[in-house]
From Swiss-Prot:
Catalysed reaction equations from the record: N-acetyl-L-glutamate 5-semialdehyde + phosphate + NADP(+) = N-acetyl-L-glutamyl 5-phosphate + NADPH + H(+); N-acetyl-L-glutamate + ATP = N-acetyl-L-glutamyl 5-phosphate + ADP
Organism: Schizosaccharomyces pombe (strain 972 / ATCC 24843) (Fission yeast)
Primary gene name: arg11
CDD domains reported in the protein's UniProt record: AAK_NAGK-fArgBP, AGPR_C_ARG5_6_like, AGPR_N_ARG5_6_like, DUF619-like
InterPro entries: AceGlu_kinase-like_sf, AcgluKinase_fam, AGPR_AS, AGPR_type-1, Asp/Glu/Uridylate_kinase, NAD(P)-bd_dom_sf, NAGK-fArgBP, NAGK/NAGSA
Protein name per its UniProtKB record: Protein arg11, mitochondrial
Activation and inhibition: The kinase activity is inhibited by arginine.
Coiled coil regions in record: none
Length: 885
């Protein structure tokens, strides 16, 4: 049987394989926003203020960055921000070198960008030049600038003019920042000590020999941005001119920042032959060849040379970016970046034998960290399986990443294993490995399970994908798709072996967490299939009490297995109500989905504008009427409709679709149809998945309701009385329409109760569980994420361990429900697709239990759950397009 292939062609790949549509207006706060009151700390006389004046930055400012990245970037970009920028010392965040032309031509843009960074608690150090301004004044005096090896020859007259110009340009930038409410400090001396570079040749040009950090540290302690000139002094006080690029580099050697950024009007280095901007330069591989290029001369040659000498002294993770002013935030906060990124790169070693890598490292990467499908349970078994294969192995210098390619069939090499330590996913080592693979193999194929971590990264690196044999098959460079078809047909025994291995092996700590000790600390339980529990009586001991009598609930014994894919046919989706937070998150999920694609997005407010963050094709917002909707349905142009509309608005559209007698699916995210028996209730983990697969009308549950039902279902038969649910949501749950519930001026240092009785979710929870509950919602100052503290009166006594085991057994095999022993936290669950259940407190009487649930209201509470329901109704794997933690 021929296998239907879907060739997904991606365009516009940039630096790390993903293109993000970033609007500067999203990132550059306007003056009225930036000019907010800054945090002022109080300290006793003589007490030294901490180096970071915002030891606890305003939480909503951090949320702003995370929210922006969630909208325009990838999960890895959010992780990079959280990992680096929320922990990096303020003075080590970034050094930004500003060319003189930037201050003349783009002062407002520069000031807004710097003010934004400062507003979210970051303190970039600015070093600026003034070359064009200096040349202009010299030209008015009929003085021709002289250069040698890219260095300005500075005589006494030039030095005198330079001093005046530097002070004026420094004052301009400081004043522009102060007007935006951002405190800035001019530092025009006392930082750089220099000696004459070559007095006879260059005259008053210096070579920096010492950097005094104190003025910079004092500036940051005072809560001001340090703005430095590139002038230096000798030990005796003689003023010397120093190239601003060199000055920024010398400062970076001392401070060792995460990023060094050079702003220039061209927005990067331009290849003199192709006239195109260079996206990236890996110096370890490209430096020698680059310096021989005829177009690399004068200032360009000096710049590249100085950058190499700088990066040779910094950690390998450091980089230098040459970008335009408007792309500053994009470079700092997204992995796609902008302009030209220069780094040393990561040395990738090549081997022909698995024995070239130490067994301990290889076992960790292949058995525990491997993202690709592999049936081996031990390193020995893995090696035995491949002993007759021709292999090519790639690893980094520290053996923290490995890729293994089977080259036995040279016409279609297969990537068998790809394992990497967590930090290597964040610092782009994996990208260096893939770049090397693409250089060595014009075509390559690999396979992943739907639950694989970093699935979206592998998707972004491919040119085609197909779901078959319960795997995602990815490839690039394959021209003859019959090869793919034949490989997939022959791969079924391998797929069956994977499934058999997973269904029989006992759970291990490594299957749940990368750190064995964390499973003991958090008491998280790893999941396997239900057959394990029916065979293993020891693991089922928690279901029995004195005398072997079972009394725990039948709900705890239910196992609803996720459904496998029965289709790989692409589907066109229309999103009505795309302006809100849920709509934006759903757009992001569909953007990386292997089969779904948007055909229309409807928003009255945004009609006619381009849809950001969607790269499969260019789409503009439209404003669809009920007649438009009916016509599209009659034409059969749409496979699925998602209604992301406010409560009470959906019905006219549903009626229009129904009148057209179409066959498309409707997933409604509002509360309008949650109580309609003719609609399926879309909470797959607690309902009939087959019914959802066969339904054309699905009502998406509410966010509070999803978390509450997950928190109560395993113990329904033990409840004695009315449970009470104390719910707190981030302000994204209040929507985008301005109100006190999403006004940060009201929410800061505050918690607002609302709808104290008869909230729609109280009714929904009670209706679905057939158990009355009391629900009290609150809104807090964080952006997204919900915590639910559920108090449950019990009929019979129970211990905390027995309670936890009920939940573990009920949600065994559900990848989007995580059960843990300790209390789950909102910040750990935010931006994650799963629900976390934990705490499991039991009163000393044993008759009252408290369960804590966290859920991301925009993902599993809305967009992720909608995608689950779309996947089921369209016949796809339930978790297609969903990253499983």
């Amino acid at each position: 049987m021929l296998i239907e292939l879907q060739q997904i062609v991606k365009s516009g790949l940039v630096r790390n394989g993903a293109k993000h549509c970033t609007k500067r207006s999203l990132l550059c706060s306007n003056a009225s926003v930036i000019a907010s009151k800054r945090f002022q700390g109080s300290f006793a006389p003589g007490q030294q203020q901490p180096l970071n004046p915002l030891a606890k930055p305003i939480e909503q400012d951090r949320d702003a960055i995370i929210r922006i990245l969630s909208s325009i970037g990838s999960r890895r970009e959010v992780e990079q921000y959280l990992r680096y920028f929320t922990s990096f010392e303020a003075q080590r965040f970034a050094i930004i070198k500003v060319g003189g032309a930037i201050i003349t031509d783009e002062l407002d843009t520069l000031a807004q960008s710097l003010a934004f960074l400062n507003h979210v608690g970051l303190y970039p150090i600015v070093v600026h030049g003034a070359g064009p301004q200096l040349n202009k004044i010299l030209a008015s005096r009929n003085v021709e600038p002289e250069y040698s090896d890219g260095i300005r020859i500075t005589d006494a007259e030039t030095l005198s003019v330079a001093r005046k110009v530097f002070l004026e340009e420094n004052a301009k930038l400081v004043d522009a920042l102060e007007k935006l409410g951002t405190r800035a400090r001019p530092i025009t001396g006392g930082v750089f000590q220099a000696e004459y570079l070559d007095k006879e040749k260059y005259k008053y040009v210096g070579k920096i020999v010492k950097v005094n950090k104190a003025p910079i540290e004092h500036s940051i302690r005072a809560g001001t941005l340090p703005i430095l000139t590139s002038m230096a002094e000798t030990a005796s006080g003689q003023l010397l001119n120093v190239n601003a690029d060199i000055t920024a580099g010398e400062l970076a050697r001392v401070l060792k920042p995460l990023k060094v950024v050079y702003l220039n009007e061209k927005g990067g280095l331009i290849n003199g032959e192709t006239k195109k901007k260079i996206s990236s330069i890996y110096l370890d591989r490209e430096y020698d060849g680059l310096m021989k290029q005829p177009w690399v001369k004068y200032g360009t040659k000096l710049k590249i040379k100085e950058i190499k000498e700088l990066l040779d002294t910094l950690p390998r993770t450091s980089s230098v970016a040459i970008i335009s002013t408007k792309d500053l935030q994009k470079e700092l906060f997204t992995e796609s970046g902008a302009g030209t990124l220069i780094s040393r790169g990561f040395v990738i070693n090549k081997h022909d034998s698995l024995d070239s890598i130490p067994d301990a490292a290889l076992e960790n990467l292949i058995i525990q960290k491997n993202s690709l499908a592999a049936p081996s349970e031990s390193l020995k078994q893995f090696k035995d399986t491949l002993k007759d294969r021709k292999l090519r192995i790639y690893s980094d210098s520290f053996n923290e990443s490995v890729a293994i390619v089977d080259t036995t069939d040279s016409s279609l090499p297969v990537l068998l294993a790809f394992g990497a330590a967590d930090n290597n996913w964040l610092n782009n080592v994996v990208d260096s490995i893939l770049t090397t693979l693409k250089a060595d193999f014009p075509s390559l194929l690999w396979r992943l399970q739907p639950s694989a971590k970093n699935l979206e990264w592998f998707f972004s690196k491919s040119e085609g994908t197909l779901f078959a044999n319960n795997f995602y098959y990815f490839w690039y460079g394959v021209k003859d798709l019959n090869k793919i078809s034949k490989f997939i047909q022959s791969d079924k025994p391998f797929a069956d072996a994977i499934i058999q291995t997973q269904s029989t092996k006992p759970p291990t700590a490594s299957s749940t967490t990368n750190n064995p000790s964390s499973s003991q600390i958090n008491q998280k339980r790893s999941y396997s299939t239900s057959s394990l529990f029916s065979k293993n009586k020891k693991m089922n001991r928690s279901l029995f009490l004195k005398g072997g009598k079972r009394f725990f609930s039948a709900e705890a014994q239910k196992t609803q297995k996720p459904l496998k894919a029965v289709s790989s046919k692409p589907a066109k989706v229309v999103l009505l109500g795309a302006r809100g937070y849920t709509g934006k998150n759903l757009i992001g999920l569909i953007n990386t989905h292997p089969y779904l694609e948007l055909s229309h997005v409807s928003s009255r407010e945004l009609e006619g504008t381009k849809l950001p963050g969607y790269t499969k094709k260019e789409i503009q917002y439209v404003n669809l009427s009920t007649d438009d909707v009916k016509k599209l349905e009659e034409e059969g142009a749409v496979d699925a409709w998602v209604m992301a509309l406010p409560n009470g608005v959906c019905k006219p559209y549903v009626d229009a679709l129904t009148s057209a007698n179409g066959k498309s699916v409707i997933v409604d995210l509002s509360a309008d149809y949650r109580f309609e028996p003719s609609w399926q209730y879309g909470l797959p983990e607690l309902n009939d998945r087959e019914a959802l697969r066969n339904s054309k009308r699905i009502s998406n549950p509410g966010c509070y309701a999803t978390g509450s039902q997950v928190g109560l279902t395993p113990i329904l038969s033990l409840i004695d009385g009315q449970p009470s649910i104390f719910g707190v949501s981030g302000y994204s749950g209040a929507g985008t329409k301005p109100s006190p519930k999403n006004d940060l001026n009201v929410l800061t240092n505050n918690l607002i109760p609302y709808s104290l009785t008869d909230h729609i979710h109280e009714r929904e929870i009670s209706y679905r569980l057939k158990q009355p509950v009391a629900f009290i919602p609150h809104v807090a100052q964080w952006f997204q994420g919900i915590t639910l503290t559920i108090n449950v009166p019990l009929k019979k006594s129970i211990t905390s361990r027995e309670l936890r085991n009920l939940y573990q057994d009920r949600y065994n095999g559900e990848p989007l429900i995580h059960v843990q022993g300790d209390v789950p936290l909102v910040k750990d669950n935010a931006h994650k697709h799963h629900v976390s259940v934990g705490g499991f407190g039991v009163h000393s009487s044993g008759k009252r239990a408290v369960i804590v649930v966290t859920i991301d209201n925009l993902l599993k509470g809305a967009a992720t759950q909608a995608l689950q329901n779309l996947n089921l109704s369209c016949g796809y794997d339930e978790y297609a397009g969903i990253h499983l933690d």
